[in-house]
Amino acid sequence: MDNQHNLNKSNESFQEFDKQRVQELEHIYVTGTSINDYSGSTNKAALKMILSQRETPQAITVITNQMMQDWQTINIDKILEHATGFYARRSASLDRPRFSVRGGNVNLIQIDGVQQFPGGRRPNVNGDSAAYERVEIVRGANGLLTGAGDPTATVNLVRKRATNTDFQANFGLSAGRWDNYRGDIDLSGALVDDGTIRARFVAAHYDKKSYIERYGQQKSSIYTTVEADLTDYTLLRLGVEYADTASEGAINSHSQPYFFSDGSRYNGKRGDTGMTAKWSGWPLEEYTYFIGLDHAFDNDWQLNVIATYNTIEMQGGELFFVYPQSPINPDGTSDLGFDYSAVISSSKDQQSTFDISLQGPITLFNRTHEVIISYNKFNRERTSYGKDADQTTISLQNLNFHEWTGDVPRYPFKDLAKQNVSITKSNGGFAAVRINPHDLVKVIMGARISSWDYHSDSYDTITGEFKKMQYQETVTDEITPYAGLVVDINERYSLYASYTEAFRPQAYFDENDKMLAPSTGASYEIGVKGELLKDTLNFTTAIYKNVENGLAEPDPNFSEKYLTPNGNRPYVQRGEGDTTKGFEIEFTGSINPNWNLSAGYSQHKTQSKEGDQLDTDEPNKLLNIYTTYDFNHYLAGFTAGVGVNWQNSFYATPQRPLSNRQSEAHRIEQSSITLINLMARYEINNKTSISLNINNLLDKHYYNSISSWNGYVLHGEPVSWQLGIRYSL
């Protein structure tokens, strides 16, 4: 009877309860005080409203700071490998993985809820994860916040906040296999006695080699932020992020051949790689400046404003690699010899963003509802420097794949000149309302209107003069709807359903040289969410369908030789494209105060409109289980954990060379595999702890990626370890 009364309380009681809930969630969200567990109880990633996972009508994963510390995930790409349904394909480079989820690529990255353009801030370019409190992931389309995108997932990185407590300091050092060294420092505290002005400083540096021969990377990052309470209801935030990344050696050719020229197998070491010069280097330097203002009004409405300016600069990236003109022979030679590619590149990205939102309660029909109105703007300019002609030719004699060491003279690159300037502009606004028609029912409805423009200009690298506009795309007043429903079954479980969209501009033109409308990606999702074990363990199960509509196809009324007056081949839009259907289940949080758990299983199938299965060269069934237990009752200060990663088989069908210089289709398959990871931590005292992490404990041999084109493969990482020590004040 008491439970029934709680579920059907009056609207006046609901208003007071909801107000208290919002205040509590705001405190947890802002301060990051989600205790030492894996729950990630609140998020703003889906709607910018502070909602619990159960209140959000989409599948959400939150990687908490505790989980990042337990498993020593120092890079964003490593963090995402712990997320349900995410697969990291490292076909070309360990630095630049391509993440896929729900049958498509993940391209949308946000920082503190503000969108970063692909290329403006990617998981592989990002600085050390030390600057972030947690990572929030929304699976499915998220066009309400972003407009342009894919119906896959959005990743939101949440920065650490300054604390208003006494001075705190945290220092860490670690060393691992392949000369992997790292150090970090995290300082925070009040700058004045009453805590109204406070600051945080985070810095990290690592230097590592790899199981891949002739490859290494160094990365330094700094993050500092200052917060000031201008009034009891107004908060000002300022901050700077800096990241300096230098990769060297085998930067972009980590895969190795699967076949020799006669069709026999190449059985090399897992670290064998392409023929890249040791001196190849790819330096990136990044600065991000941000300022934010938050204000709470007397009527419980909130104003949030944030502006950022970001630059990524590469000065003199040099890449030199050799490749065979024909398949490699068993003795390491090539019948047609070897050629080389020499690339020197510099670029500068400048990106500015502005985001403002206003949200709060309204009363309608004697019930309280929540409304949010938001506007955001993104501008990005990328300048590339290169050289079109007058490249020096060098001679490489008597090359052999088996004997390649990377010790070649430095290539005499020419001076660079401006080659290309591309400008992207995007702006849009959205409005959404969380309607409360019944104490057990919440309906979310919203829509976004977006404009998007991209154009690229080329320049003569000899004279430096403007040559022509190479490319232009424009989208105006694109509408993106959002609809969600959450129904509470009881105090523990809720049913939810959602329909979300995103759009993608298309650089295709019809017979009249008019650019086609954007394609749209739609996500249909239903599921059940729960808060188990006294609300300490989150549970989600979801069934979804992603559909791409309005994809461009060649106009069947014109021959392939026909071109429009501007030299374009005519295209038309043909309705439905690829379809992905899938299922996910996830548990995150704590089973009891000593036992943390993050477990997720996903499976999907992607088909073309003709019914052909796509993406067979990646696993479509993934299981991640990460759990830790604090043995304090048995051995004071000792925590241990195990991680399990399972994936099903996948395959590619490249062309296998034959001895007569012919070829035939040949299937290369990676069977299903289970990887075991371990962690252990011992607190020597209340200030000092030591830790050990072991990945791929059983040293399983497997392929991370298989090329459908030439059959080249990249081996997964062998067993590795990392030993760390941490000291706190």
Residue ranges and their predicted role:
Residues 206-210, 223-229, 233-296, 311-349, ...:
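Acidic/polar loop-and-plug regions of large Gram-negative outer-membrane beta-barrel proteins
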Residues 289-311, 340-459:
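Face-selective signature of the C-terminal outer-membrane beta-barrel domain
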Residues 439-440, 545-547, 572-655, 698-699, ...:
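Gram-negative outer-membrane beta-barrel transporters
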Residues 118, 131-133, 144-224, 230-234, ...:
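Outer-membrane beta-barrel translocator/receptor signature
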Residues 646-657, 681-729:
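C-terminal beta-signal and adjacent terminal beta-strands/loops
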Residues 294-298, 302-308, 312-318, 495-496, ...:
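Membrane-embedded beta-barrel scaffold of Gram-negative outer-membrane proteins
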